[in-house]
């Protein structure tokens, strides 16, 4: 049984020292697409965290009963089932956001973070540790999404969560929104800048030269 210290390390590690986007550079595609607004970034974070945590839990519970030859198929079946549930919940209770997220909720099925944690961690680790690892990786993914979404929505549209923060010139204010920040390529450069800042502050995260 895992103790509290181990659980804390498993939960906080992916957020601080082993971030799936900043260190491992996984899950970047969806990060480029859903970060033009804080609302979509937050919902995507919750969706991926729920799927990653629950898939880790169920796969870990079944790990001793899954034949090695079909383990990837079983993992994808479990992940796909959870994604369908999440997608249906979003369409029922947050339809407008679900429309904005479009296919990217469905693409959680093939998200590198979810698949990677299922194969590399949940298949070898007890259920509670696997569940916390899923939450940690989801929150680590979300930390980058929300950071990028904050910059893109605030300076690209002058608002946060749809609430005007910077009064726009078109409405008689002073701020001229930077429309470039609302385009997907801007997220690529922002994520790159974040990774550069993190690796400057933490040199140990820089890959060793071969």
Swiss-Prot record:
Catalyses which reaction(s): a ubiquinone + n Na(+)(in) + NADH + H(+) = a ubiquinol + n Na(+)(out) + NAD(+)
Q: Where are the transmembrane segments?
A: 14-34, 42-62, 72-92, 103-123, 131-151, 178-198
Kindly list the places in or outside the cell where this protein is found, as annotated in its UniProt entry: Cell inner membrane
Task: Provide the GO MF annotations for this entry.
Answer: oxidoreductase activity, acting on NAD(P)H, quinone or similar compound as acceptor
Task: Output the HAMAP family linked to this UniProt entry.
Answer: NqrD (MF_00428)
The Swiss-Prot or TrEMBL record describes its family as follows: Belongs to the NqrDE/RnfAE family.
Assembly notes: Composed of six subunits; NqrA, NqrB, NqrC, NqrD, NqrE and NqrF.
- Know the name of this protein? Na(+)-translocating NADH-quinone reductase subunit D
Q: What species was this sequence derived from?
A: Shewanella woodyi (strain ATCC 51908 / MS32)
């Amino acid at each position: 049984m895992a103790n509290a210290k181990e659980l804390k390390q498993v939960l906080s590690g992916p957020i601080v020292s082993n971030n799936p986007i900043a260190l491992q550079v996984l899950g970047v595609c969806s990060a480029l697409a859903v970060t033009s607004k804080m609302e979509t970034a937050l919902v995507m974070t919750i969706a991926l965290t729920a799927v990653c945590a629950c898939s880790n839990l169920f796969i870990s519970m079944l790990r001793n009963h899954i034949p090695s030859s079909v383990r990837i198929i079983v993992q994808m079946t479990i992940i796909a089932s959870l994604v369908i549930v999440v997608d249906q919940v979003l369409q029922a209770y947050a339809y407008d956001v679900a429309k904005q997220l479009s296919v990217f909720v469905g693409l959680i099925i093939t998200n590198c973070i979810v698949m990677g944690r299922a194969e590399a961690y949940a298949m070898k680790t007890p259920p509670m540790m696997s569940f916390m690892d899923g939450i940690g990786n989801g929150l680590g993914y979300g930390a980058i999404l929300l950071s990028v979404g904050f910059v893109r929505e605030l300076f690209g549209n002058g608002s946060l969560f749809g609430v005007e923060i910077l009064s726009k010139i078109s409405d008689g204010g002073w701020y001229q929104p930077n429309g470039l920040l609302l385009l997907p390529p801007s997220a690529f450069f922002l994520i790159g800048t974040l990774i550069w800042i993190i690796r400057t502050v933490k040199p140990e995260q820089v890959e060793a030269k071969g």
